[in-house]
Regions:
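Short alpha-helical segments used as structural interaction elements across diverse proteins
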Residues: 1-2, 46
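Sec/Tat signal peptide C-region and signal peptidase I cleavage site
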Residues: 19-23
Length: 280
């Protein structure tokens, strides 16, 4: 068990933070409606971060306003050339959802911090990884990124039209955000959450209540770390027991799926369609 956990830690460090070999030789695959913003300063962390914005197909030809989905690990979302082992293809999938389901959402991808990823996306300290910086990271998302996006793009800025989704450590920080910033985010996607690195998450979940009207999509693959599905199920049961604030929950486990972008890419369109089904 300990060996498997160490291997997963190594995978989180290498697979999601180390630049791939010959990345500069791969063609850029981001669609024309993905825009890369100038780096933004992260107050409290004294770093800068690139933010990527996907705009729906109708954005330039209409005056309508759109819901917004905030995602982590922006390098892996839109462009094969900036990803580690392949992009999610969020831009292509959102274009297809707009065409076939009339679902149009602005997607904001916040790049991860490379070697800082394991602390930036964890709200709690960890003896092996370091001091948790997740609270500062979320203050950056809510206090800097979201106001900029709302000021420069035609968004629907209210809680009912604002979502967050992430995988692995991105799933962990999205879980934390739905409680700490329940007045900002009402729709949360939690893919393959790294609950194992933050055992405090269970007591945190028991001690907090979600704001009314939350929608939460949980996902894991059956062939991930042996504790992945069990940890996720334990969190789901805690949330379901909170009758007064029980959110709309959807839990999906894909047989044979592992901890990688390919699995998350396959799950993404189903999660997004469900999360926004009552907000079009």
């Amino acid at each position: 068990m300990i060996r498997r956990r160490l291997l997963l830690t190594a995978a989180l460090l290498c697979c999601l933070t180390t630049p791939p070999l010959h990345a500069d030789e791969r063609p850029h695959t981001a669609q024309p409606n993905v825009h890369v913003l100038a780096p933004m300063h992260m107050f409290g962390l004294d770093r800068e971060r690139v933010v990527r914005v996907y705009l729906p197909p109708s954005y330039e030809s209409t005056s309508k306003r759109y819901p917004v989905l905030y995602m982590h690990d922006g390098q892996n979302l839109f462009d094969d050339a900036t990803s580690f082992i392949g992009e999610w293809g969020v831009d292509e999938m959102m274009n297809e959802l707009a065409r076939t389901q009339q679902l149009e959402v602005i997607v904001v991808g916040i790049d991860h911090g490379d070697e800082k990823r394991m602390t930036e996306l964890n709200p709690w300290d960890n003896d092996k990884v370091g001091k948790g910086e997740g609270r500062d990271y979320l203050r950056f998302v809510v206090g800097i990124v979201k106001p900029y996006v709302d000021a420069h793009y035609r968004t629907l800025p209210d809680r009912a039209h604002t979502a967050m989704l992430g995988s692995s450590l991105g799933g962990l920080i999205s879980h934390f955000a739905m409680y700490e910033y329940g007045d900002v985010f009402s729709r949360i996607g939690i893919f393959s959450p790294a609950y194992w690195i933050a055992p405090e998450v269970r007591e945190f979940t028991r001690a907090h209540a979600l704001a009314p009207g939350a929608r939460v999509w949980f996902y894991a693959g059956s062939m991930e770390d042996s504790e992945m599905v069990a940890n996720m199920d334990a969190i789901v049961e805690i949330m379901r027991a909170q009758r007064a604030s029980a959110p709309a929950l959807r839990v999906e486990v894909t047989p044979g799926a592992v901890h990688n972008e390919q699995a998350w890419r396959a799950e993404f369109p189903h999660a997004v369609e469900w999360l926004f089904e009552d907000a079009r």
